[in-house]
Amino acid sequence: AHDRAFSRGVLVDLARPLLRIPNLAIHLNRNVNSDGLVLNAQSHLAPIFGLATEEPESLRDLLVDELAARGAPTRHEDIVSWDLSLYDVQGATVSGASSEFIHSARLDNLASCFAATQALARAPQTHATTRVIALYDHEEVGSRSAQGAYSPFLRQVLERIAQAGDALDAEAFARAISRSFLISADMAHAIHPNYADRHEPNHAPVLGGGPVLKTNVNQAYATDGEGAARFAALCRDVDVPLQHFVVRSDLPCG
C-alpha cells in the first residue's frame, strides 16, 4: 500500500499454476536432439500469462483479488510496484524401489539452507562462540543484489557483533575472523550412471553416501588442506561417512 507518507510491503503467494513457458513442439524443431536446445532469453523465455482479450486480467487485478481474499481489501491505485519471483508449483515427491530418491525443485541449495538452519536452532547455547549462518539469494544472477553474497550486510553485522563488547577496539573483528572456521555449504554432483564419463574416475560420490568435500584444481571451491582435515575430523567425531569430489581437469565446475 502507498500514500504520501510511506509505502508498505506485503508478501503475496498466489500458490497456483499461473504462468508457463511452453517449448516448441518437436514437429517444428526436428533437429533439437542432434543440434541441442538453443534458447534466446528475449524471444523464447517469455512466460504465457493468458489469452489476449479486449479486457485482459492484469497482475494488479490478481493481487487485488488475493489481498481481498485475505481480508485486506486494496484499491488498484494503492499497488504501486512489485518484485516478482516465479517458482515451480509442482510439489516434491519421492521415488525409487525403496523410496530413496527425492525429486523437488530448488534442492540446490535449499537443502543446505534447511540443514544449516536446523543445526543452528539445535546447537547448545554458549557464550564462548558466536554461531552464524548466512543464507544468500540471487546466486544464479550474479549475487550482487542487496541480499546477495556480494552485499556488505553480513560483514557489517559481524563487525557490530565483534565490537559489541568494546566499540573502541578496532581489531576485534579481525581477531574474531582469524579464530573462526567457515564452511561453504553447497550441493555436490553424485555420479550419473548415464554420464559417468563426466566425472573424475577416482572421485565419484554416490547419493546417500555422506557429505562431500569438493576440490577444484582452479581453486573454485573453498576447500584447502587444513579445512578438509578439520571437516574430516568432525565427520569422524559423529561417525558420518565422508566422500570426496574432484572436478575433471578438462571440465569447468558449477
Where are these regions (language model features)?
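N-terminal hydrophobic/helix-forming segments and targeting peptides
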Residues: A1-C253
